[in-house]
Amino acid sequence: MTNKQPVRVAVTGAAGQIGYSLLFRIAAGDMLGKDQPVILQLLEITPALKALQGVVMELRDGAYPLLADVVTSDDPLVAFKDADYALLVGAMPRKAGMERGDLLGANGGIFKPQGQALNQVASRDVKVLVVGNPANTNALIAQQNAPDLDPRQFTAMVRLDHNRAISQLAEKTGQPVSAIKNITIWGNHSSTQYPDLSQATVGGRPALDLVDRTWYEQEYIPTVAKRGAAIIEARGASSAASAASAAIDHMRDWALGTSEGEWVSMGIPSDGSYGVPEGLIYGFPVTVKDGKYQIVQGLEISEFSRGKMDATARELEEERDEIRKLGLIS
């Protein structure tokens, strides 16, 4: 067993589909390591608190040695109190006929108060991952409403796209996913994202030597970008288990570090690297050491890549301008 003090992990939307796939894995130590006890602090909207109690009963019935305690609330000031990690999963899904502005406005009503609550009561070193879509811009809303925290503490999940990109390439090349290194997802977690294979390797060989350029540009990129829609079409519901798994991967790498010589994709505040407008929450290739991420520098950007990277940046700028107009950020 462990002598480590428990850390506090806040999860919003905890009674939802992704929450249900996520909480048991956090309790089992998949996210922060098999020697790190956790206190789960679960936030839900008032009507979902009863369902959340059922999830808590199951968490307790799992008798997880690492699960030190579970707190539930419909108040972010309770759920985020002293949180070391916060996974913001709960969001307003897009409904038929909704314009992007409507969706951003509805989510602003969630992420603005959550940013303010994190600012008020979370640990000063809290690591925040926004999973709820539109994740990049929801992360920006939360971040801009938490002025006392370092902007770099707010990240958005592009790891699901990253994992999808790995698995599609593995399938195409007939190699195990473990053979694939250094794929990058640039930009927004949306259909404008750019899954970039220009630096990727498969078993040490350049990925683009192993696949056809036409397949890469015309099939691979759209397949990865539209995978979420394909899952809804097939399953009748959005991806939940794979999203939870990606959230675990993102937080584990942020907390425990990336492997030597490898990078992963994280949605993080741009510092202007690669000509991406500063301040946007944008997918970049990063390495992590001692809980701090760094953008991988010095990668060659082709004309094709530049066009894709700029297009997804433009979409994020439009979303930022929209939330500014709505008064969600200044």
UniProtKB/Swiss-Prot annotation:
Identification of the protein by name: Malate dehydrogenase
PANTHER family to which the protein is assigned, alphabetical: MALATE DEHYDROGENASE (PTHR23382)
Protein function: Catalyzes the reversible oxidation of malate to oxaloacetate.
Pfam families the record matches: Ldh_1_C, Ldh_1_N
Keywords for this protein: NAD, Oxidoreductase, Tricarboxylic acid cycle
Ligand binding (NAD(+)): G13, A14, A15, G16, Q17, I18, G19, N107, Q114, V131, G132, N133
Active site: H189
Catalytically driven reaction(s): (S)-malate + NAD(+) = oxaloacetate + NADH + H(+)
Presence of keyword tRNA-binding: no
Binding locations of substrate: R94, R100, N133, R164
Family: Belongs to the LDH/MDH superfamily. MDH type 2 family.
GO biological process terms, semicolon-separated: malate metabolic process; tricarboxylic acid cycle
